[in-house]
Amino acid sequence: MKWELEKEIKLPTAALGLSTLPHSESLLVSCFDGSILRVDPRESTWETLGHHQSYASGVVSVLDGSMAVSAGYDGVLQWHHLGSGKTVAVEKIHDFWSWQLKASPNGRLVASVTGQYLCGGERYEPAQEKEPSIKVFDAQTQSMVAQFSHLPPVLSVAFSPDSRFLAAANMMGDVRVWDLKEQRLECSWNTPDFTSWGIIKSHHYIGGIFDLCFSPGGEHLLVCGMGPMRDPMAGNGKQTWQRLEWRGETPEKVGEIKDGDRGRGLMETLSWHPDGKVFAMAGRMAQGSWNVALFDAQEGSLIQGMDNKTRITRSAFSPEGTQLFLTGSKSQGEPKEGKWSEFGRLMIYQTVPSDEKTPPSEASEGS
């Protein structure tokens, strides 16, 4: 089985967040201009549910698809009722950006992470947080039910499959897991393989773990980003994922992308296929042959790599596993006749037999 591009939908601005909806073919997308969209991929149309005052970094569906929650660089959570299409609540939850927003698998919780990289000493290590870096909210009551500390900036967050544990990771490669029921730190771990110290041009730290997710059984964590660089502005660190076994006395790395399978570039999103046998990683490519790839979950080997010449920010499989949804952006280019191009993208891949290819005429919408 292979994956082929089925459809490419142009959006007005870069798409930063993505969520599927239960019992619906529609998708939720959050955008660079602050807008929250409900997209109908069949018709390539959308409606605007709400608007943030800065980049809308994430959007999720909760409460069995009856509500959408969005977060942005304005540090605000917005709650959108999908039946009426109206924004029903707005709350300032962070003094800085919401880097990432995730919903628990049971649809009852949402978690947002924040944190600003400020110099904390002579070695330019990050300063300690000024506010709790992780906040968890009840989807029904919209009230905060937990908050946890971490070293900022905290870039990524994930719930375990049973919705009991919460993991978060930062720029320095620190991963922490909390037990939400007991409100305690379960484990912590560090990997140096995602963080750069600038030797050329800029002397500071950069990079980090841009996404993480639990395995379907919950025993492992996958984390992704890119490898260290001498020039932090180059964006050419090695495409990287690692697998962590976190439940033991001492968390340990038990898997990693093979050198022969990877190129260079920032990897920003991970998604597990519903059958648990495959996972996807995507981002942007600086050098190599792919920016979207499917990996065998057991062996960790590359199954298929694809280059769609897009910076991918979020990914999600359809519930039945026959489609892979990707959001991101193309190069914006120069304005033509006073108008900027539609540089946001929603890409839909579908599974096809290995000897069958999607007709080129059906692969994109005006690309």
What is the predicted role of each segment?
Residues M1-S367:
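WD40-repeat beta-propeller superdomains and closely related acidic/aromatic-rich repeat-like regions
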